Amino acid sequence: MSKMNFKRILLVTMTLLTMTSTAVAGKYKNFKVSTYIRAQDVARMEDEKFLNQTWETVSSQVDLDKIYLETHRDAFIVPEKTLLKVKKFFQSKGLEIGGGITFTRSEPSDFETYSYARPEEREQVKHISEYTAKFFDDFILDDFFFIDLKNDDEIAAKGNKSWTEYRLRLMADAGRELVVGPAKKVNPKVKVIIKYPNWYDHFHGLGFNLEEEPVYFDGLWTGTETRDPGSAQHLQNYLSYNIIRYFDNIAPGKNGGGWVDAGGIHMSMDRYAEQLHLTMLARTPEIILWNYMQLNDVKIDARMRAPWQDAGGNSFRYDEMVAPFQKNGKTVTPTTMARFADVTLHETDKLIGLLGNPIGLASYKPYHSSGEDFLQNYLGMIGLPMDMYPQWKEGQQQILLTQQAAKDPQIVEKIKQQLKKGGDVIITTGLLKAMKEPLGDVVELYCGDLKAIVNDFGFLGKSDREFIIPQVKYFTNDAWEVVSAGRPLTGGVSGYPILLRDTYSKGMLFVLTIPDDFGNLYDYPAPALNVIRRAMSKDVGAYIEGPSKVALFPYDNKTMVVENFNDTSVNLRVVVNTKVNSLRNLLTGETYKPATLPQVVSGWGRNRFFGYADGATVFDITLPAHSYIGLGY
């Protein structure tokens, strides 16, 4: 090779390295942080004073890499002159620029969407897509690319189909014909991204088509807001992580990031920070802080300081967040929630780069399936790490099936094959009830309409409250109870399975009893939860022991994050299923030595699920309220 050619190759290599470095270089090491401006607020930015003042407030408190400018919402389109002016302003601040569309006609009217059976409204949607593609090389459809109307035109177009069938076909076609196709004719380079909201288990009823849309859209985005679990949607904290993983598995490589708004911040700063943190634990490449005006307007309030902050040692530290700090040579006094986001994401960034790829207990949810809605998020909150897939996941030692799996007409055969390979299948009582006849060829178990009120788990402890469970019936000596409950069970007259096991071929089938109110899973006593966690830890290689509302996030490089969602500190045990010398805090370097415990080796039958397996290693840790720890072994 000549010196000249060598120099050329070296120059090209250096250029590529520089381009790669520039592409990932930003305010954060492991992800991008972005925000989004609604169309009406973009229009207000025609006023330069407003534009400059809001930017000063937001940018002084949170580091941003990108901003999305919305062109349409509620039948309003931002004028071209204003859009170009605002775009130029943010480009001058060093931000990447993307676009956005919200296909609503009136949010105040129960999020009224466009009527896709009406030709004139279809033309409006097409025009908005074309208009947006003129200005941006990527744009996001915010949340509302579904249909919630049952007007006379939609009723006539539906015909004899169910609403779900009609809407799934209607919106899959509308995405191709009215959004992606027209946009790419205007701008062949444009990437059109569909952002899905957080209510994934109900998507199909409104026309969100997770089977087809992620194929032809250039990317997707994930709503990770869980807000206040007591509000209308009743979503559990864990969903902020779980939904990212589910969408990653639907369209590997196409999930652009998460999306969190200010919802839940009235509960405490911690509730907002947790949503951001959990989103990033799923190793997503970007997060959108929705929206820009919330970052400007939602003021810091002393009521956002939770009582548990007094104990100290928390991962999210209110007093530090609201203290004055230095930025670009100036002293900044925090005034809005933007500061909460900045501190949380910079702290999380320190941890994310040390983690591998997320892993968990594979749970099969077929496309457009219903039943035991959002249950996996409750299971995540009792320490079972979830990893949801739209297809059956081969090569797993264990598979979790909820009632949703009944939608697959081949589900019984898939269960048989998993068991014949020596794997485990864990089914819920919801699936058992839905599949009584087909499952009879595998196990003769029955779950009907009979209920029981329980609060006593025998030697595994008692619940602080009574709750209702479905009764599972089985043949003695054909299936075996691993965890039982009654009222009372100790010295009582009856008991019912909470975790039941049966064998088939080389494998084992478990039935996990789900209470009528999923929230009562949090009332299972810690020793009972420990048995359940251990029985379902084969693919993860580790589990936790302790109360509910503590989640485990494992990764494929022998790291994990343990997070406490309780309002009080908790004492926990981290159990690694193999022998290891120590457990280390990934951020501080502190090491934990194995606990000195009598190793109870698993015995025969039911006893194999209690104590610790031969070779397992146990570590004791304490986690403050609403805090997390990154660990490696």
Language model feature labels by segment:
Residues N377, M386, T402-Y633:
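A conserved amphipathic helix/loop scaffold
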Residues D47-V58, L375-Q396, Q403-A406:
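A short, well-structured beta->alpha microelement
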Residues L11-T20:
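Bacterial N-terminal signal peptides
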Residues A43-Q61, P119-T132, H202-E213, S268-T279:
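Short, acidic/polar
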Residues Y28-Q53, L83-D137, D143, I147-N151, ...:
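Active-site-adjacent "subsite" loops/lids of carbohydrate-active enzymes
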